[in-house]
Amino acid sequence: MKETNNSEPCLKISFKKGLEGIELPLMKTEKNGYTIFFLLDTGANKNYIRQDFLNLPELNNDTITLDDMEEFYGIDNVCHQAQTCNFRFDLGEYGYMERFQVISDGAALMFPTTSGKPFHVAGILGTPFLTKYNAQMNFRTSELLISLPEGQREPEYNLDSLMADYQV
């Protein structure tokens, strides 16, 4: 991961680790007021999202378009075909737009729990997301520090220029 410039505005997000049956850190996000969980995986070379998740009416995903099929090699070294899409989600008050590889098998991101009810994860935020936003993961404090998205950064105000607006 790249180092985050200390003068660059950042967002600090808490994540859960060691959740029952899930080894990767888990981050809670939102879209249209709907809670979404993503795994954070520094070893994933792509971002992944479940296809059945994209069809949830609560998310109002009618603007999401799936791109043409692409080929990729999985961990089993077998060539697979999948679609990609852009998906926007919210972290705090900021919106992040990311490109995802669509996973057609939703069972790949469901985890069993002791209650018997599976825990559903929308997808995986991998190296593309973590690198793009200069992510720094602190496993001791369970915090993720990421850069704010372009175009959504707080404007830098210069006191002299603000005062010039008020001169008579």
Description of each model-found segment:
Residues 1-168:
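Pepsin/retropepsin-fold aspartyl endopeptidases
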